[in-house]
Amino acid sequence: MLSSLVSNGLLQTPDRLEPMVPWWSFTKTVLAATALSLVRDGLIRLDDPVLDQPFTLRQLLRHEAGLADYGELAQYHAAVSNNEPAWPANEMMQRLDGAQLRYSPGTGWRYSNVGYWFIARLIERLTDLTLDDAVIQRALCPLGLSNVRFAKTRADLQTTHSASSSNYDPAWVYHGLLIGPISQAALFLDRLLCTDLLCPGLLLEMQTARRLGGPIPGRPWITPGYGLGVMQGSIDGGYSLCGHTGCGPGSVIAVYRVCDGDASACSAVFAAGASEGAVEAIVVAQLMQALRQRG
């Protein structure tokens, strides 16, 4: 297990040579921040239709666009298990019948990696940059992060701590898969939510969540929800967490931030062979300990 803690903006873990780890779906939070920077700069509005589609950027970011997800396909799971190369994106959409919306945008909720693939394409179109360069210029670099990049090949993942995913083709993550040190994930989220990369209004929009039912067995959530690229919800003690959990072959990452008055803490944990709930529980324990120590 690897972990990193930021308390009141200061990295608590000692300086060390850190391994790279896959950020899995925490990448969505980075993509959301990049997309919201486009809103900040007037290149698009949250409620504008995206790429000539019937859904808006807000609906994509919050998984309300009506899109399906390739995780529903048995042949997808079989191909990943067999270490097969990723299908081209157009083949994935054809196999999924991805152009057929599953519900009218804005009327339901369905977690969709395909939605974030649309967001990645939108970022490239509106910036006239590659996704790599757009994310670096608009999100990573402004927040002081430099050792984070997209994994493009199996060889890229072989450089990470997650040995069990070394034969996994990162192109299966159609919206892109970031890799970086665990401390950089904690710093990214903490700085995103407490600096002026995005204006207060956009940060409020980002953290305005759609409530998704009640407590989840084996997870810390009492009222889980999803905002614009962030998992947002309450836990025991009346605290509200904001961040994201991600999982891939053999490993899980969870990155969350909590505030209590003027105090804040942000924890990132990566573990191989663990469940999402187990890793989230470690994050919650670290956050609560950090708040107690500040008290």
Kindly give the residue locations of the regions a language model identified.
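Catalytic loop of the DD-peptidase/beta-lactamase superfamily, centered on the K-T-G motif
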Residues: 1-22, 136, 167-295
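Active-site-proximal loop and beta-strand segments within enzyme catalytic domains
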Residues: 2, 7-10, 15-111
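Short, well-structured active-site flanking segments
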Residues: 10-13, 37-55, 126-154, 199-204
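Alpha-helical scaffold elements that line and support the substrate/ligand-binding pocket
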Residues: 24-43, 60, 96-97, 110-139, ...
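Secretory-pathway/luminal and periplasmic proteins that interact with or process carbohydrate-rich
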Residues: 62-72, 142-151, 211-218
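Carbohydrate-binding/catalytic loop surfaces
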Residues: 82-85, 154-175, 231-233
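A beta-strand edge to alpha-helix "cap/lid" segment located at domain peripheries
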Residues: 103, 152, 156-158, 282
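Short helix-to-loop capping/linker segments positioned immediately adjacent to catalytic or ligand/cofactor-binding
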Residues: 104-108, 121-126, 175-176, 217
